[in-house]
């Protein structure tokens, strides 16, 4: 990362969204203070999310909450929207805040065009925040990469 880049905080990112700076259809996430444009969702990507979510729901039931493409707040400068996050149940279903690392059991990214980014940049961001289990499902290579206990 360049030293002269001004990082944006999660609060500033939310304020920018509330002011309408981003187009409502833009798929963005905040990683290490930088606004990252996410790739368009392809059919194979969406199908993999659906199958993975279904399998997790069947095996875990109501013991956890399975969120798809919803924000998790890693720290003051990162709020990614992983394809799947398995989080602790919450009485308000996280109405008052996005899940934080201590509330996250597992994060899964489904990678088709984003494999390098998911395996390098996001792995580091999740590890730095204390996410204990991070998986990258490479749908093109048909591989699962597991990153555990950073």
Each model region followed by its residue ranges:
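Gly/Pro/Ser/Thr-rich low-complexity, intrinsically disordered segments predominantly at protein N-termini
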Residues: 1-150
């Amino acid at each position: 990362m360049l030293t002269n880049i001004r990082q944006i905080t999660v609060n500033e990112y939310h304020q920018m969204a509330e002011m309408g700076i981003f187009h409502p259809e833009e798929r963005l996430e905040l990683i290490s203070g930088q606004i990252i444009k996410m790739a368009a969702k392809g059919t194979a990507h969406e199908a993999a999310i659906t199958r993975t979510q279904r399998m997790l729901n069947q095996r875990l039931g109501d013991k956890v909450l399975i969120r798809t493409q919803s924000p998790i707040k890693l720290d003051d400068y990162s709020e990614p929207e992983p394809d799947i996050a398995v989080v602790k149940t919450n009485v308000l279903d996280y109405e008052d805040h996005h899940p934080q690392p201590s509330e996250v059991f597992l994060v899964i990214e489904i990678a088709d065009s984003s494999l390098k980014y998911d395996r390098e940049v996001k792995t580091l961001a999740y590890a730095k925040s204390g996410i204990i289990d991070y998986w990258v499902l490479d749908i093109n290579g048909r591989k699962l990469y597991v990153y555990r206990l950073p």
